[in-house]
Curated annotation (Swiss-Prot):
Lineage: Viruses, Duplodnaviria, Heunggongvirae, Uroviricota, Caudoviricetes
GO molecular function, one term: DNA binding
Residue ranges the UniProt entry marks as DNA-binding: 18-37
Gene behind this protein: CI
UniProt entry keywords in alphabetical sequence: DNA-binding, Repressor, Transcription, Transcription regulation
Protein name (database record): Repressor protein CI
Extent of the signal sequence: none
Keyword Repressor belongs to the record: yes
Domain HTH cro/C1-type intervals: 7-60
Origin superkingdom: Viruses
Keyword Metal-binding part of the UniProt annotation: no
Stored Pfam families: HTH_3, Peptidase_S24
Coiled-coil positions: none
Length: 223
């Protein structure tokens, strides 16, 4: 079942018209119609839609678990008590020269265990996932890898990897390395420096970098 089908099923479960559901979540009827027809591939209103329809946000966003949030989940099925749904964006984090994102939209999401998030000292409400694009961060991050980042962690720390907004509006994933002089290198892990040269930032100017968040996990396929 796709997102459009789950939204329609949730609305019917709540016995609401498109107009009634739209009014409850602060959208217009056309927006609900576009979602149910698949014309809109994602929405940042998942939590509001789920609440208005009385269904599980985890189910509505990603199809995990039971539709009815009050219904006991099947053994082994993800539950909202144990798992957090982290919003996924259509924007791709460029591991290269910067991928221009003129619009960022939440679409479905990925789930992570709450106890693991607690161990890494991150709160679900501060987290987002994007997909890496390009090879400048190889071998640490490969093209197509999922990247989880924490928007509450924006202070530069030596050898950490960050999602950074570029001056042209693009988003890049880079590692920050502090030098003995106090200056910082904004660098790619790819050793080909002719293709991916390092950038310098002074000790004072590094704090002016538009850091969106620190990468706390990445994952992808094998081979």
């Amino acid at each position: 079942m796709e997102l459009k089908d789950r939204i329609k099923a949730a609305r019917k479960h709540a016995k609401l018209t498109q107009a009634q559901l739209a009014q409850r979540v602060g959208l217009d009827q056309t927006s609900i119609s576009n979602l149910e027809q698949g014309k809109s591939q994602g929405t940042s209103y998942i939590a509001q839609l789920a609440s208005a329809c009385g269904v599980s946000a985890l189910w509505l966003a990603a199809g995990h678990g039971e539709m009815n949030s009050n219904k006991e989940a099947l053994p082994g099925a993800p539950s909202e008590k144990d798992y957090a749904l982290i919003p996924q964006y259509t924007a791709r984090g460029e591991c290269g020269d910067g991928y221009f994102n003129d619009h960022v939209e939440t679409t479905e999401g990925l789930v992570f265990k709450r106890d693991w998030l607690k161990r890494v000292n991150s709160k679900p409400e501060n987290l987002f996932v994007i997909y890496a694009d390009g090879d400048s961060m190889e071998p640490y991050i490969f093209e197509g890898d999922v990247v989880l980042f924490d928007t509450s962690k924006t202070d530069p720390q030596d050898k950490q990897v960050y999602v950074i907004r570029r001056p042209d509006g693009g988003v890049s994933i880079k590692r920050l390395n502090q030098q003995l002089t106090g200056a910082w290198l904004i660098r790619s892990d790819n050793p080909d420096k002719s293709a991916y040269p390092d950038e310098m930032a002074s000790e004072s100017s590094v704090h002016e970098l538009p850091i969106i968040g620190r990468v706390i996990w990445r994952g992808g396929g094998i081979g």
